[in-house]
Amino acid sequence: MANSASGMHVNDECKIKFLELKAKRTYRFIVFKIDEKAQQVQIEKLGNPEETYDDFTSSIPDDECRYAVYDFDFTTEDNCQKSKIFFIAWSPDTSRVRSKMLYASSKDRFKREMEGIQVELQATDPSEMSLDIIKGRLNL
């Protein structure tokens, strides 16, 4: 069982689907939620490769905390196709205090178990994870 110091247990399915996103590019994004009763992080939504960044942001609830990973494709100045895996810790101001604390205390453990995250973003408002912010983190 997890405790607040070490963070919530990460369900094996989360790790498997993340590896599929990273290695096989089976998914564009994954949204994760903490199930307090089960004491673990679980998958809430898998985004198909053809889904857009707007599809991704609309799948995250406005007033509840979530973790998410997004495989962002981009073209460099010298015309190379690349991708970076973003980790987004979504903790809106309108979410419950207990939920914010739970997600904050479990974040490091979650990231450790999702090996291959390249860029981290903390957002409390939709503007903090806009496409412009994402591109800015890539220096595009």
UniProtKB/Swiss-Prot annotation:
CDD domains reported for this sequence: ADF_cofilin_like
Lineage: Eukaryota, Viridiplantae, Streptophyta, Embryophyta, Tracheophyta
Superkingdom as given in the UniProt entry: Eukaryota
Compartments where located: Cytoplasm, Cytoskeleton
Transmembrane regions: none
Record's keyword annotation contains Electron transport: no
GO molecular function terms attached to this record: actin binding
Gene Ontology CC: one annotated term: actin cytoskeleton
GO-annotated biological processes: actin filament depolymerization
Tissues in which the UniProt entry reports expression: Expressed in the root trichoblast cells and developed root hairs.
Record keyword Phosphoprotein present: yes
Similarity comment text for this entry: Belongs to the actin-binding proteins ADF family.
Main location: cytoplasm
Organism field: Arabidopsis thaliana
Residues of the ADF-H domain: 7-139
Residues bearing PTM Phosphoserine: 6
Key words of the record: Actin-binding, Cytoplasm, Cytoskeleton, Phosphoprotein
The protein's name: Actin-depolymerizing factor 8
Gene3D superfamilies reported in the protein's UniProt record: Severin
